[in-house]
């Protein structure tokens, strides 16, 4: 595998970064805003930025954009994901003693919902330069997943987008830690 040649900067010579923060189901609002901007301005959000960075639920939106989806195409699956992954019965952890020692939400349900959207794409399949952070529990340090947009950034291209999505969204208490290439990663 050889990384794609470095893409030229957008017109104007500035390097434009779209940064998407987390917030669980609140990332649905972000996807709606991006979809509305595309509609109102008649632009492609993905094509308006050189790099997209996203953490936690914002990382899920970033990965969706990297998978070639428009913000409008992300909204509907994300709405379904919120209903499936965050059922009303689990929103009150103090009512379930087991949830004092285990994650509130089911990581397998999240993985299944993410697989429906991202399929078997790897980070190397991304149509955009992406940067998705996570926290390496063993090393006690940030772990940043990066597309191979530079000759020295070739480590992560084979990692499935779903695994990266699980790592960046593995918020302690809410979801179990993700295992990616032998590393235990959390949000």
Predicted segments, located by residue:
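A broadly tuned preference for mixed-charge, low-complexity surface segments
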Residues: 103-117, 176-187
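Patatin-like phospholipase
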Residues: 15-19, 25-114, 149-154, 158-165
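Structural motif corresponding to the C-terminal cap of alpha-helices
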Residues: 37-41, 118, 169, 173
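Flexible, membrane-associating and regulatory peripheral segments of lipid-active enzymes
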Residues: 1-18
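Solvent-exposed loop/turn segments at secondary-structure junctions
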Residues: 22-25, 137-139
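Active-site gating loop/helix substructures
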Residues: 87, 93, 100, 125-186
């Amino acid at each position: 595998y050889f990384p794609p040649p470095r893409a030229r900067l957008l017109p104007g010579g500035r390097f434009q970064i779209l940064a998407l923060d987390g917030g669980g189901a609140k990332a649905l609002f972000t996807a709606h805003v991006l979809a509305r901007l595309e509609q109102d301005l008649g632009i492609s959000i993905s094509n308006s930025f050189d790099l997209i960075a996203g953490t936690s639920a914002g990382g899920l939106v970033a990965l969706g954009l990297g998978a070639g989806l428009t913000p409008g195409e992300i909204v509907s699956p994300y709405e379904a994901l919120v209903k499936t992954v965050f059922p009303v019965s689990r929103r009150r952890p103090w009512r379930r003693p087991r949830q004092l020692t285990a994650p509130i939400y089911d990581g397998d349900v999240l993985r299944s919902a993410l697989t429906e959207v991202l399929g078997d794409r790897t980070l190397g399949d991304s149509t955009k330069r992406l940067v998705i952070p996570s926290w390496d529990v063993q090393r006690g340090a940030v772990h940043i997943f990066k597309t191979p947009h530079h000759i020295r950034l070739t480590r992560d291209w084979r990692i499935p987008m779903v695994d990266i999505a699980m790592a960046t969204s593995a918020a302690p208490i809410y979801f179990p830690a993700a295992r990616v290439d032998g590393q235990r990663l959390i949000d």
